[in-house]
């Protein structure tokens, strides 16, 4: 038994950096486990949760680094198409994925979490998601997915309705 209990915290913007520093020390320096889920903020960085579902006979990752590069290019095209002015600021993509797929009895799960250093409100994030959905099949049609694109590109995270596991945290 893990002896892990749920709780809810409201960390102010002023305290967020201190929280992240303490979290980093706890997880990455002291090698301790954490089980933290956070909500995406309105006027926060763009977070994209890509959930892949495959037939249970699949036991290895189906996407490659080329798929990820193509997705980043799709996003950059979306920024250029949707937003008039990006102020020539550098755009960073932080890509997070597990090393292996998760093989269950009836489905194989995989996915990618992406954080982009662009601040946007929820309505802008949803507009960006719509752009992704309209174009993603052009780059990833060959992936043998069992789920549709609407469920691949998780809407709840971009609306702020779902938790996002903090990097380094795990499920209990």
Model regions: which residues?
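Signature for HUH/AEP ssDNA processing cores
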Residues: 1-147, 164, 170
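Structured partner-binding subdomains within large eukaryotic complex subunits
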Residues: 148-172
